Amino acid sequence: AYAVHSSKSVNIADAYTEEGFDFSGTKAFDKKTGYGSHSFLTVPMKNHENEIIGVLQLINAKNRVTGEVQPFSASEQYLAESLASQAAIALTNRLLINHLEALFESFISLINAAIDDKSPYTGGHCNRVPELTMMLADAVTKTRVGPLKDFKMTERDRYELRIAGLLHDCGKITTPVHVVDKATKLETIYDRIALVDTRFEVVKRDLQIAELRGFITEIELAAQLKQVEDDRAFLRHTNIGGEFMRDEDVARVRQISTSYKWTDASGNDCDFLSEDEVKNLTIRAGTLTTEERQVINHHIDLTIDMLEALPWPKHLTNVPEYAGGHHERMDGKGYPRGLTREQMSVQARCMGIADIFEALTAKDRPYKKGKTLTESLSILGKMKLGQHVDPDLFDVFVWERVYETYAKQYMSPEQIDDVDLSKIPGYVPPPAH
């Protein structure tokens, strides 16, 4: 303690005759173990800012000829102080590396926190995808069957993949929140279905006025009001979006758009739905238009641009490739670069499966409910058959029951059903060892 507080070396010739320091603990240790602790040399270790970061302590200098314990000489103290200086440099370098890694990961967390705050619906995605990616990658390293049985990762490889997973959607920091969180087809900053509802109320009022004025009969009024309510219910349902919109439903939206007229604040007669509203309400699947889908897809371009602009150290040089490939397909029809399976690393293909499975099972999206295990695996299996995801990784995902491990941590009990693997598209039993 004295060496640390005084920043001075302490050279004790013999602990048993030394009066300036309390060596009762040392003597008790010697008595218990039979060891003889006599000469001590304690040297403080200082970093580049002259701060004490540790001590180097040597015990029992020995005479090279007789082997007897003797005090540490001045030359030995000088040598020890030189070694302590070198040790301090090495320790400082290690601490600096640890601090830089901690700072770097804090910046990653900062970016993800900003994305989470923008979009609470997809907030957990940035954390769940890297977790599932690592689960799958670790399962691949453990598998002893199939084409991937020789795949291995070191701890550095795992760290690199984890960092890539955490950064895989960093480009979303610029994506407009009303596009990311678009829960219904007519939603922009707010859901425009309320405007459509208001127009229906205007149409109903006009019909009631027409009946009062004798332009239509009471029976005609009742029939037309029923049609208005039917059309309103249809548009409300259509606005939600879904897996697929039928041709007849698209035609009905277009028919409704011109079936009713309403007068705007300027006194102009307008079609019931604007061209933009028709375009949005006739989105075939989901809630995004082609233009909005392009805005969403742009996040991966930006992710790659951001990551490739960074001066990565040698052990992290693959981060842009791993993070930037999770929207590619095995048949080369993905985006942004149209890479094929052979042009992608196993790690990037792992992240592709993780990104899809997380999205299928996520229960915090505004536009859909989280799917069950059976539903999610069935969709993923069809993607295997359609050359969307890597077939070998899908097999490992199923064989090693990675989906079960993930489900226990991140899925609701009602989503975790009993999976009959024989009914999952693309499933093949594992080969014999």
Regions found by a protein language model. Name each.
Residues 13-39, 61-71, 329-340:
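Signal-transducing coupling segments at domain and membrane junctions
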Residues 23, 36, 51-53, 59-82, ...:
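Regulatory loop-to-helix N-cap segments in sensory/regulatory domains
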Residues 51, 67-92, 159, 346, ...:
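Amphipathic alpha-helical "output/dimerization" segments
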Residues 89-108:
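Short alpha-helical interdomain "coupling" segment at the junction between an upstream regulatory sensor module
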Residues 1-36, 264, 282-283, 289-290, ...:
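Regulatory sensory and allosteric helical modules in signal-transduction proteins
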Residues 38-47, 54:
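A short, aliphatic-rich beta-strand micro-motif
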Residues 106-433:
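Histidine- and acidic-residue-rich, metal-dependent catalytic cores
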Residues 43, 48, 59-61, 342:
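Output-coupling edge of small sensory domains
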